[in-house]
Amino acid sequence: MEKVDVYDELVNLKATELRLGLPGTEETVSCGKSNKRVLPEATEKEIESTGKTETASPPKAQIVGWPPVRSYRKNNVQTKKSESEGQGNYVKVSMDGAPYLRKIDLTMYKQYPELMKSLENMFKFSVGEYFEREGYKGSDFVPTYEDKDGDWMLVGDVPWEMFVSSCKRLRIMKGSEVKGLGCGGL
């Protein structure tokens, strides 16, 4: 046995051994059948001497995507928007044939007639009169809007509050292009 110890000292296998781990850390003895990791400080002898068979579990790693920050921020922003009355509901307004766009705040108006007067003054045109069955009569232009679903609808078809909450943009179209939007008289 002494020859083996002398050989180990001369060759110094431990110093030249290649292994994974940080330099200066001692190798831990682990059971070949267990899939659990052993803490580097605790060896089998220490575990047996203390009488404890379970080791303290490492702190739980945060699951990717948890907590759902994106949905939290989205909900938080929506509640802030509903709480603040000072913010306006700005939408773009375009008119067929006009080379420019405008942006208006829908919360400034109380009903459709106020909005129509403002649009007439802004773009210098006449809308005419709105009838529920026939749509807009007496004008070459018809105001339409895009709702939050992406559908184009006639301005005045829904109650004012619903219009203000669902309108994404306004477009004043030529009457010849509006035939499929729901008014039979055009």
UniProtKB/Swiss-Prot annotation:
GO cellular component annotations, sorted alphabetically? nucleus
> Where, subcellularly, is it found?
Nucleus
Q: What is its main location?
A: nucleus
Q: State its role.
A: Aux/IAA proteins are short-lived transcriptional factors that function as repressors of early auxin response genes at low auxin concentrations. Repression is thought to result from the interaction with auxin response factors (ARFs), proteins that bind to the auxin-responsive promoter element (AuxRE). Formation of heterodimers with ARF proteins may alter their ability to modulate early auxin response genes expression.
Recorded name of the encoding gene: IAA4
Which protein are we looking at? Auxin-responsive protein IAA4
Tell me, how does this one assemble? Answer: Homodimers and heterodimers. Interacts with TPL.
Query: Domain PB1 spans what residues?
Result: 88-175
Q: From what superkingdom does this record's organism come? A: Eukaryota
